[in-house]
Swiss-Prot record:
This is Phosphopantetheine adenylyltransferase. It comes from Lactobacillus acidophilus (strain ATCC 700396 / NCK56 / N2 / NCFM). Homohexamer. Pathway: Cofactor biosynthesis; coenzyme A biosynthesis; CoA from (R)-pantothenate: step 4/5. Signal peptide: none annotated. HAMAP family: PPAT_bact.
Amino acid sequence: MTIALFPGSFDPITNGHVETAKKAAQMFDKVFVVAMTNTSKKYLFTAEERTAFAKDALKNISNIEVLEKPEELTVKLAHELKANVIVRGVRNSADFLYEQEIAGINKRLAPDINTVLLFSSPDNSFVASSMIKELARFDEDVSQFLPIKAAKALRKKLRHE
């Protein structure tokens, strides 16, 4: 059985994240989607909120389980979950180079775990949570980029109800 871990900040979860999770679900027997905390980022939503958005967006995919493990090293979590693959989404060459570095470090820390990079479709290749939050701050409709609950919560959080 191949178990994959798809970690992310998901602040908030985007259609690109959902696309990556769905692709992973087609490739692996079990996929853990985990809202984690990157200590170099400042978050708009709590870990609980980010997890709830992911659970809602992915609820109809039977081999995906959404968890919240905000502060843990990814490879340690992969071992806890018995995952032998870490899945990451890649939108562009900058993402690729960043993920290549992280994959190298992870391989050193956990030689038994492989990283699989899944490339986004052209429709999602420019969608970044940070960009979507910026659009929403200026009262732009971001519903085409986010799952429904995440879009509504973002609008409410920024008081553009």
